[in-house]
């Protein structure tokens, strides 16, 4: 359960917290000028039988946000959780265990389209309100030769990435087209997350008087 807002210290009443260690998610938020703290979640990433990929991504996003929000020592009001998965033929592709696993994943994606699904959750610690959803992007890979696959693996980029590639890196050279959100493939559906933060009163991205973060005073 979420911490009782009435028992939260006063200095917990403002601020955004990203419950993720992903540098890519941090870069996306920072790139639009949002101020936030990073507190990686320790929530277990376990699968549930008969769960759809979308349900899986949303559930894990909520778990991550809730786990960090429930830590009494963590300061902040709005908590962002996210989980990104790559799905090919209804099979979820995680992060490659080793070079052979990466080669198998890339070979299975070669010359085909697949889906990248990012779940996201934004939790307001004070009101207890939670907003969560998932965004799907279709990614098309060009046909890759075995030499290209091995060369890409040698760069080290596939490791630590769901599906064994990074669209924001060298992997972009393998992807002629996508249908949907680019930032979703990077790891965070930025448009939807920022819109949710605005609805919950955490940011004012397009306010003429900015500041970006609602809890900060406007410039004199």
From Swiss-Prot:
Q: Where in the cell is it found?
A: Cytoplasm
Q: Which InterPro entries match?
A: ITPase-like_fam (IPR029001), Maf-like (IPR003697)
Matching entries from CDD domains are given as: Maf
Site note Important for substrate specificity, residues: 24, 84, 168
Task: Identify the domain of life.
Answer: Bacteria
Q: Where is the active site?
A: 83 (proton acceptor)
The protein's annotated catalytic reaction(s) are: dTTP + H2O = dTMP + diphosphate + H(+); UTP + H2O = UMP + diphosphate + H(+)
- Write down the EC number: 3.6.1.9
Is Cytoplasm among the key words of this record?
Answer: yes
Main location per the UniProt record: cytoplasm
Alphabetized GO MF terms: dTTP diphosphatase activity; UTP diphosphatase activity
Query: Which residue ranges traverse the bilayer?
Result: none
Cofactor names from the entry are:
a divalent metal cation
Q: Which Gene3D superfamilies match?
A: 3.90.950.10
GO terms classed as biological process: nucleotide metabolic process
One GO CC annotation: cytoplasm
Keywords in alphabetical order? Cytoplasm, Hydrolase, Nucleotide metabolism
Q: Which HAMAP family match?
A: Maf
Q: Which NCBIfam families match?
A: maf
Family per UniProt? Answer: Belongs to the Maf family. YhdE subfamily.
**Function of the protein:** Nucleoside triphosphate pyrophosphatase that hydrolyzes dTTP and UTP. May have a dual role in cell division arrest and in preventing the incorporation of modified nucleotides into cellular nucleic acids.
The name of this protein is dTTP/UTP pyrophosphatase
Organism of origin: Syntrophotalea carbinolica (strain DSM 2380 / NBRC 103641 / GraBd1) (Pelobacter carbinolicus)
């Amino acid at each position: 359960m979420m911490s009782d807002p009435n028992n939260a210290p006063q200095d917990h009443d403002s601020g955004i917290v990203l419950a993720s260690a992903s540098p890519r998610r941090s870069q996306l938020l920072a790139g639009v000028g949002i101020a936030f703290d990073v507190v990686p979640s320790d929530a277990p990433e376990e699968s549930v039988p008969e769960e759809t990929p979308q349900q899986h991504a949303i559930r894990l996003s909520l778990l991550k946000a809730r786990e960090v929000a429930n830590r009494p020592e963590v300061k902040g009001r709005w908590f962002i959780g996210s989980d990104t998965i790559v799905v090919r033929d209804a099979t979820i592709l995680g992060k490659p265990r080793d070079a052979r696993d990466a080669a198998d994943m890339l070979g299975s994606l070669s010359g085909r389209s697949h889906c990248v699904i990012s779940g996201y959750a934004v939790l307001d610690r004070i009101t207890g309100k939670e907003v969560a959803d998932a965004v799907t992007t279709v990614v098309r890979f060009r046909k890759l030769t075995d030499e290209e696959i091995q060369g890409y693996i040698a760069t080290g980029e596939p490791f630590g990435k769901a599906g064994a590639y990074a669209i924001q890196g060298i992997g972009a050279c393998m992807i002629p087209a996508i249908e949907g959100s680019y930032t979703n493939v990077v790891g965070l559906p930025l448009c939807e997350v920022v819109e949710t933060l605005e609805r919950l009163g955490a940011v004012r991205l397009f306010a003429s008087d900015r500041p970006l973060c609602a809890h900060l005073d406007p410039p004199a």
